[in-house]
Amino acid sequence: SARVQQAVHDAVRDLQGERSRSELSVPLVAQRAGVTPSTVYRRWGTLQELLADVARERMRPDDPPDDTGALETVLKAWARQYLEEISSSPGREYVRDLVASEGEENSEQCNRYCQVKIRAILDRAAARGEPHPDADTVTDRVTAPIVFRVFFSPGDPEPAWAEALVDQVLADL
């Protein structure tokens, strides 16, 4: 039920704030959520799949990005926010959980969530008559480099670097 899912997700998020990853277990999550471990296993199969499901839900877009004006301004603000979210400790953990999950559905869903936000920005630019790239171009040339840099390069990228990625995309229009 939706109530069980919410209770289990809340328990995972609470426990992630209190304990290290190695201390998490299905019985611990179940106890915190007020359900039996078999309920968790039946629904998610493994702790890793549960963690991936929580990560996917966290990445679900709540609202479209703020429309603060021109495409350049909005896309740069979104790129800075995306960089900040994904480079935070919880953001890194969520991405790791998604990548470690079996199958591709969680990763594909997160890509769709990201595309929804990007398309909202681009659709508003189109409505204003602004030239704009397509969502795949923004994903390939802004989102993907951010993810790569956060996970595979030393140090955290600066927000100005994320803005420069947007500048490069817009310069090619």
Describe the predicted segments one by one.
Residues 1-32:
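Basic, helix-initiating cap at the start of DNA-binding domains
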Residues 18-21, 41-51:
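HTH DNA-binding helix-turn interface
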Residues 26, 55-62:
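Short, basic, alpha-helical segments at the C-terminal edge of helix-turn-helix-like DNA-binding modules
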Residues 33-37:
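Short coil turns linking two alpha-helices in DNA-binding domains
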Residues 48-55, 84-105:
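Amphipathic alpha-helical segments used for helix-helix packing
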Residues 63-92, 139:
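Hydrophobic alpha-helical connector segments
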Residues 84-85, 103-128, 140:
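Amphipathic alpha-helical packing segments from all-alpha helical-bundle domains
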Residues 112-115, 126-169:
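Hydrophobic/aromatic-rich alpha-helical bundle segments in the mid-to-C-terminal region
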